[in-house]
Each structure stands twice: as structure tokens, then as C-alpha cells.
């Protein structure tokens, strides 16, 4: 309400409202161990909108959920999409010349879903993350969360993999497999 009374341009008002929305959702989601796929993807969309101006006009982001998947009913670890998306933008796409592409794709597998985050940025260089204003904290938290959850689930486990794209492509691909039957109780 107070933002609408702000005497800035419409773009500034919009960005400020998106920032407030992002911060509010960030606080909500980081307090939870699991969230619906829909909530996580909505959060990621807000983050992408905030970063769009900084990354540049030649930034294209797509989020696709395969037909037949009910994103409101599928539970996933909180931040499991947001952290790879943030890393792709910060470390792969920001400052890159030319077209910048970020794709999030959610597909069905036999007993779960696969979430793939792909960019056409610089590629994944673990030793460079800390040198490019990153601390690696997001990935460390993600790995520890997955490890903890996997120890509590005796059958199917979450699988998380980061690779550099091949076949002459540049960029990084993060692939996450999440079983449908998975407990988030610790």
C-alpha cells in the first residue's frame, strides 16, 4: 500500500514490489524443509524478475512443467530450484556477452520427478565460485540438506548433479531427481 504512494517511476515501483514479495517469500520458504513445487517455482519466477534488469535485455528465462504433473501437490526440498537458478544467473550469465538463456524444466520419471536447470553461461568451475563474489554457501546448504534427508529415507533418494554442458555447448546443467514417495520428517 505504501509502495503505491511512492513517487518513483512505474518500473521502480514494480521492482520495489517484486523485491518486497521476494523477501517475504524468502523468509517463509527458508523456514520450511519442504514446499510445493508450485511455491518454489513462483519464488524462482519472482527472483528472475528481480534479476532481469541487472542481467540485461538479452536474458531469456523459461520455466516448463511437463503436462500431467500437479505442481501444487508435489513436495520438494525448499530452495532446491532457487539456489541453482541464483548461481546460474550470478556466476554463469551476469556479465556474459550475447544472449543469456536460463531454462528450468520439470519432467516425470518412473518414481519421481527430474528438475533440470540449464544455462548457456561460463560453465561450472568450483574453484572460481568464491573468486566471483560467491561463497558457495547455497550449494553447501543444499548438499547438507539433501544428505540429511537421504539418511532419513531408506529407499529412493534425492540425487543432485552439476555438470558442464557438452556437445560444444557452453554453460552448466543442474539435475535433481526427487522421488514421489519421500519423507521430509526428521
Regions found by a protein language model. Give the residues of each.
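Two-component histidine phosphotransfer core
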Residues: 1-159
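Hydrophobic core positions in the C-terminal catalytic ATP-binding module
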Residues: 102, 170-178
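A short beta-strand-to-loop micro-motif at the C-terminal edge of the catalytic HATPase_c
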Residues: 157-171
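Two-component histidine kinase transmitter core
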Residues: 179-184
